[in-house]
Design a protein with these regions (language model features):
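Tight coil/turn sites that cap or link beta-strands
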Residues: 79, 86-89, 136-137, 144, ...
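Short, small-residue-rich packing micro-motifs
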Residues: 65-72, 84-133, 163, 168-172
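Well-ordered beta-strand positions in beta-sheet-rich domains
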Residues: 52, 56, 81-83, 89, ...
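Short beta-strand segments in beta-sandwich/barrel cores
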Residues: 41-43, 72-74, 89-90, 116, ...
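C-terminal interaction modules
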Residues: 1-29, 51-54, 68, 97, ...
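N-terminal post-signal-peptidase region of extra-cytosolic proteins
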Residues: 46-61, 66-71
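Short acidic/polar mixed-charge low-complexity motifs
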Residues: 49, 78-80, 138, 179-180
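Short N-terminal segments immediately surrounding and downstream of signal-peptide cleavage
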Residues: 30-48
Length: 239
């Protein structure tokens, strides 16, 4: 009896291991999204090879999406949307989507450089804990909303909470290795200089959404640019 139970246990363990390997291989090889907007120069680095991105191009697990003087819009199969602005780099570190399993779904994105806008899809609705958005200096916890991230050449990050397509606003957490802040209001912003620095106190941008796009996108990110923006263009929300 004990021998039979041991054999059944070993068989179950083997089946689980095989399933995980197959799922990993499937995620790596399968299309997880598509380019829905493409203007100017854009490319994708995949398995060490770089190729041009065009409208309807497939997006896959571990892709590094890069833009020059152009921009790319991507819709993932769970309806997550990202907009990669000019002179930017977005890395898809992990993506698994099972519409019937909150635990089995996961999304990890890394903004390495430039400006990227994010709008939550079904993975965040299934389990917001399974969405992990990162920059070199910050980690953003998503709670069903939209926001933008701008990263300069040395990793300093500016994160801005935005209204979603319906006009409502959720919230996000922004954390470094030593501190965390919560953004809850439209156009609220925080900046993170390094992983060892506390995110700045949230402030309200005195800007419209289109102004944010123009100010943060028209030129390649420059060192300290985002700090000048914070000093000169951000003010506390009027009461």
């Amino acid at each position: 009896m004990q021998l039979a139970q041991m054999l059944i246990s070993l068989l179950r363990t083997s089946l689980i291991a095989i399933s995980l390997v197959l799922l990993s291989s499937l995620s790596y090889a399968s299309t997880i999204g598509n380019v829905v907007l493409q203007e100017g120069i854009a490319s994708v680095e995949r398995k060490g090879t770089e190729s041009d991105l065009k409208l309807d191009s497939d997006i896959m697990f571990m892709d590094n999406v890069k833009t020059g003087k152009g921009e790319v819009g991507i819709t993932f199969i769970d309806d997550t949307n990202v907009a990669v602005s000019s002179q930017s780099s977005l890395i898809i570190d992990d993506f698994v989507y099972d519409p019937n399993s909150a635990k089995g779904s996961k999304l990890i994105l890394k903004v390495a450089l430039g400006t990227v806008r994010y709008a939550s899809g079904n993975i965040a609705k299934l389990n917001k804990q399974n969405v992990d958005i990162r920059t070199p200096t910050a980690r953003i916890g998503v709670r069903g909303t939209a926001f933008s991230m701008t990263v300069d050449e040395i990793g300093q990050s500016l994160i801005i909470l935005l209204p979603n397509a319906e006009g409502s606003v959720g919230e996000i957490s922004v954390e470094s290795d030593i501190g965390q802040v919560i953004l809850t209001q439209a156009f609220q912003a925080t900046s993170v200089r390094s992983r060892e620095a506390t995110p700045t106190k949230p402030k309200i941008l005195d800007l419209t959404e289109s102004m944010i796009n123009n100010m943060l996108i028209i030129r390649p990110p420059k060192r300290r640019k985002i700090w000048k923006l914070l000093r000169l263009k951000i003010k506390r929300k009027r009461t």
